[in-house]
Design a protein with these regions (language model features):
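Helix-loop boundary and gating motifs at the non-cytosolic
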Residues: 33-96, 250, 254-299
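Loop-to-transmembrane helix entry/capping segments in MFS-fold secondary transporters
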Residues: 81-82, 170-183, 291-295, 379-389
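Helix-to-loop junctions at the C-terminal end of transmembrane segments
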Residues: 98-111, 201, 308-323, 408
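C-terminal ends and interior cores of transmembrane alpha-helices
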Residues: 120-136, 331-345
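Cytoplasmic helix-loop-helix junction between adjacent transmembrane helices
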Residues: 145-188
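Intracellular juxtamembrane helix-capping segments at the cytosolic ends
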Residues: 154-169, 281, 364-377
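C-terminal transmembrane helical hairpin of 12-TM major facilitator-type secondary transporters
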Residues: 323-369
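A late C-terminal transmembrane helix in Major Facilitator Superfamily
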Residues: 376, 380-411
């Protein structure tokens, strides 16, 4: 196997680089060969190596098993649904805190070093949670272990996106294809992961489901860490470079958040849409006497999203990020209103149809938000930026599920279906606040991005 360097970005005075996504707004730049959609996707294994796609997909699978696995484990072993819900929320809080921390460390010292520490810690945290829940440990111990499980969950999806940004400099269509693939992989994972938990818990036990997730994390998380595409830490900009660009852009959390605030808010709204929709669907199915089928009904949204995320690369270059964001978020709003009407009608068929339509607009918005996030962040902070977006989604899901549950219990199922429409409107507003063309930013030369052929 040989490693191939990516084209280097032109120099910029602040001592950083904005990566491939930043190249979308630069001119002039090398023209990317025009390829068909399938040919563009065919570039991905050539750039990263054939093993990268399955390794990265399986490595992210345990992440999608944590929330439902923790809920099921704690609820079953303690007999308390309330404690199970708290433990699940604690894992989400841990993820929201640990995700950006992992990303920032990966930016500084490289992904491999971070993952080689985080993966074993996550396995130990899962084992500790299983032990605590199974032996009747105090609630505080169980919740503490759940926080650690979330905090040490490897941020495979965001870190994989960082690798694609490095490998696709000056290749905007290939970058879009990579982001589309990543969103599809996420969607499939978030459908498959909970299904695996349910199957393993039914056949064996909730403990077996969580330990299976830990085993997959150990094997494929380490394989992801050791893969040649792992990005090294970026060299620290000189004092003069930081002064020229503003140290906040490279050093502080607040400085980076200021740069990527719009996509972070967009991802928060997207998470709220997911969480509130899931809760509303669960309430709908509970009213129908088939609560155990709520996951299958909600999965309809994920399948539609996975398909359209892959299709984003076929959109013309003239259909820019801001236009895509606003257009597809508007489609989300319309279809969320249809879901609201379907939820109020009591018709399962109508609800499934509305969710299928809703999912068609989710994928393109997700791809666009991650692409914009990469565009707005310096490459020296791309890991932190991507994990910020993922963490915002986790927080949004928890917020949407919490508020949705209260509305469903206090007002009714039909009212709960109004919350996804509100979240979709927030997505439109955040998209409108995005500048139509990012300010011109020069970029500096990056070290050769890893690639495997």
């Amino acid at each position: 196997m040989t490693r191939t360097p990516s084209p280097l970005a032109p120099a910029r005075p602040d001592g950083t680089a904005d990566g491939a996504a930043g190249a979308l707004a630069q001119a002039p730049e090398p023209a990317e060969p025009r390829r068909g959609t399938l040919a563009t996707y065919g570039e991905l294994p050539r750039l990263a190596g054939k093993a990268f796609l399955p390794i990265a997909f399986l490595a992210r699978l345990p992440f999608s098993m944590i929330t439902i696995g923790t809920l099921l484990l704690v609820t079953t072993t303690t007999g308390s649904l309330a404690l199970g819900g708290l433990a699940s929320a604690a894992a989400a809080v841990g993820t929201a805190l640990g995700g950006p921390t992992q990303g920032s460390l990966a930016d500084r010292i490289g992904q491999r070093k971070v993952l080689l520490v985080v993966v074993p810690l996550n396995v130990l945290a899962v084992v500790a949670l299983v032990q605590a829940a199974s032996t009747g440990a105090a609630s505080g111990v169980i919740l503490g272990a759940a926080v650690l499980v979330g905090a040490f969950a490897p941020q495979v999806g965001p870190l994989a996106r960082v690798r694609w940004i490095a490998m696709t400099q000056h290749r905007p269509r290939t970058l879009l294809a990579a982001m589309g693939y990543e969103s599809t992989a996420d969607e499939i994972g978030f459908v498959l992961g909970p299904a695996l938990v349910g199957i393993l818990a039914s056949v064996w036990s909730p403990q077996a489901a969580m330990l299976f997730a830990a085993a997959v994390c150990a094997v494929f998380g380490l394989a992801f860490a050791l893969h040649p595409t792992a990005t090294p830490g970026a060299p620290k900009p000189s004092a003069a470079a930081q002064a020229a660009a503003g140290a906040d852009a490279h050093g502080s959390f607040v400085g980076l958040l200021r740069r990527v605030l719009v996509p972070v808010l967009g991802m928060l709204a997207m998470g709220m849409l997911f969480g509130s929709t899931q809760t509303a669907v669960t309430s709908f199915m509970r009213d129908a006497g088939a609560e155990e089928q709520a996951g299958l009904v909600y999965a309809v949204l994920g399948f539609g999203s996975a398909i359209t995320a892959l299709a984003v690369v076929a959109l013309p270059a003239s259909f820019g990020a801001r236009s895509r964001w606003v257009s597809f978020a508007s489609g989300l709003t319309v279809t969320a209103v249809l879901a609201f009407l379907a939820g109020g009608s009591g018709s399962l068929g109508a609800l499934i149809g509305a969710l299928a339509l809703l999912g068609l607009f989710v994928g393109p918005v997700m791809v666009t938000i991650f692409t914009v996030g990469g565009d707005l962040s310096p490459s020296s902070r791309s890991g932190a930026a991507m994990t910020m977006l993922a963490s915002a989604n986790v927080v949004g899901v928890a917020l949407g599920a919490s508020v949705g549950g209260q509305v469903a219990e206090g007002v009714g199922t039909a009212a709960a279906f109004a919350l996804p429409a509100v979240a979709a409107v927030l997505l439109v507003v955040t998209g409108l606040s995005l500048r139509s063309r990012p300010a011109h930013v020069d970029t500096t030369a990056l070290p050769p991005a890893p690639g495997v052929v």
